């Protein structure tokens, strides 16, 4: 059962024009949702599942990648986007800030052994700004991330994550700061993203988070992949084509 909660304001950053990063406030109705598991993304490449999993909760260890305005080129440099499929993009996530020209490691949270295997990414404001490349969330997913917690997101990046089944939730600056401190103090701490109760939990702490109603509804009902939805309606599409004389 879906329960309607209070109206909230969510800060997203639209990226309609290259180089423009102006804040926007989207007023949305919040919904409370029910529990399920995390699937692999289909994204129109390879086999598309006919029934997508409902995603309402993600848990695991987390890593904090500091800095506002982390753009998609930093997440996945453009030279790695020549691939025919998205397979293998994970190893190039944050490549230019993780690696020197000779391939040796730079100081970076993702290079620290204590954060290996982290499945939840924590970030600051305007995460995923810049170009709208869908390779960025693909690289994050294939690196192993299953959810992102940030102060705010670029609008197109947020949508691209949703269509991959990656929940993006927004927390206050202070709550992100406290969460990051807890993660850095104890990298083994489990972080839970609970879309049912709109909370993020870690240790004995629980903080409120928000998202957009459309993204949350898509995730919790298992309708976050448009191609899979289209394939589920194949019989209806075929019937309409016959009706119109196209088949």
Regions found by a protein language model. Give the residues of each.
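Extreme N-terminal basic, low-complexity initiation segments
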Residues: 1-10
